């Protein structure tokens, strides 16, 4: 089986992850690189205003992981605008009650274990000023900035290496240069 590389785009909501993932997918396909960009399951929940489902990060992550499993070993790269480890940042974000209170250390260890079994290229997107859109989201700009900090902290505390890339007109080229070096 082919060892697929996972391109993880990390940042809070509204930083441009989905737009960048789409552009990256387009540019890689133009270069005849075998890649996939699975649909961001949490975005589907946001558009459907599925507040109950988004609180259950085990459900969210299972559906998000299906997108990886579907094309893993078939393509060279999978581009994720909702990396698996984001579940660690979101598990307590919507509620500290049921079902979030079920997900303790064992959930975190499982997510880290799954993440570490993949060949990852981790990118933290540094959002531009005034980039946030509330449409199709559960979070406002302030919460999104807090999530940026929480995500970065999760990566650092768990010794997960990542490359910071500023979101601007050169972002996709910068990611391509990193991925294809």
Place the predicted regions along the sequence by residue.
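Walker A (P-loop) phosphate-binding loop of P-loop NTPases
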Residues: 14
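Conserved lysine of the Walker
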Residues: 17
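Phosphate-binding P-loop
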Residues: 1-6
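A glycine- and Lys/Arg-enriched "phosphate-lid" helix/loop adjacent to the NTP-binding pocket
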Residues: 95-171
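Conserved nucleotide-sensing/catalytic segment adjacent to the nucleotide-binding pocket
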Residues: 50-100
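Hydrophobic anchor at the beta1->P-loop junction of P-loop NTPases
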Residues: 9
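Short loop/turn segments at strand-loop or loop-helix junctions that form parts
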Residues: 40-42, 82-84, 124-128
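Conserved substrate/cofactor phosphate-moiety recognition/catalytic segment
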Residues: 22-66
